[in-house]
């Protein structure tokens, strides 16, 4: 009889946000598939959990997913986790879940925090309709194509961005989407959690003087003002 894959949400910053059900699940499975085993080990140690782990990330290749699926088909249970938040969101976990569906492996969700939804709720922007766009490509051509494709969307746009790329991303957003209202959420649920609101041009000016720190979630309104120089 096949085992089961548990999709387990982990904290996006504050370890106290790990649910009791998630703690129970991580403690009972046969093994854990982790984006970065070093990050997950810190979480397990905090909750006094000892479990064997295998790494599963975007550079793992198809064989790692096949190996995990084979173990599940042999009757083992596995929890898939990402470094922070829900697996499968801007994360290769979706490929493992798809493979489990194809092979008839039972899947169970153990929901947890999501940086995108948390940031949207804190942004004060329209939450009735939104589009999660993940990380923009590092290639300028692909970034421009992505932004051009969504520039007329009538919904709030949500992006993830790393601190070292934030300035370039703000420049690209301004150039392609115009000078929209934006909310920058950083270090969500951590000590230095911050929400900064204004126009894209104001954010560009802000970070001429400041060095971006921490992981960012960007939320933009869908109505653009005329682009200003």
Named regions from a protein language model:
Residues 1-58:
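Glycine-rich, flexible N-terminal cofactor/catalytic loop recognition
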Residues 12-15, 83-87, 163-165:
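Short glycine-rich anion-binding loops that position phosphate/pyrophosphate groups of nucleotides
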Residues 56-61, 136:
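Conserved helicase motor
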Residues 68-114:
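Glycine/small-residue-rich loop that forms an oxyanion/phosphate-binding "nest" at active or ligand-binding sites
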Residues 95-153:
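Class I SAM-dependent methyltransferase SAM-binding "motif I" and its flanking Rossmann-like core
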Residues 143-147, 166-176, 180-211:
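Anionic-ligand binding region
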Residues 211-220:
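C-terminal edge-of-domain segments
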Residues 221-227:
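Conserved small/polar residues in nucleotide/adenosyl-binding loops
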């Amino acid at each position: 009889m096949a085992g089961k894959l548990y999709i387990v949400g982990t904290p996006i910053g504050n370890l106290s946000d790990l649910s009791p059900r998630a703690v129970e699940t991580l403690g009972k499975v046969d093994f854990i598939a982790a984006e970065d085993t070093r990050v997950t080990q810190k979480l397990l140690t905090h909750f006094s959990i000892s479990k064997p782990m295998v790494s599963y990330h975007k550079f793992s290749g198809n064989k790692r997913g096949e190996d995990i699926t084979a173990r599940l088909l042999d009757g083992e249970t596995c929890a898939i986790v990402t470094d922070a938040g829900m697996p499968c969101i801007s994360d290769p976990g979706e490929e493992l879940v798809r493979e489990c569906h194809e092979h008839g492996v039972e899947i169970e969700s153990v929901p947890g925090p999501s940086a995108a939804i948390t940031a949207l709720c804190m942004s004060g922007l329209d939450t009735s309709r939104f589009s999660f766009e993940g990380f923009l490509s590092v290639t300028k051509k692909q970034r421009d194509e992505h932004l051009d494709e969504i520039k007329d969307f009538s919904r709030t746009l949500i992006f993830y961005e790393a601190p070292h790329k934030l300035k370039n991303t703000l420049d690209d957003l301004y150039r392609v989407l115009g000078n929209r209202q934006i909310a920058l959420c950083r270090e969500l649920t951590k000590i230095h959690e911050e929400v900064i609101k204004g126009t894209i041009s104001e954010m560009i000016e802000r970070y001429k003087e400041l060095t971006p720190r921490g992981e960012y979630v960007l939320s933009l309104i869908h109505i653009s003002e005329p682009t200003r120089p």
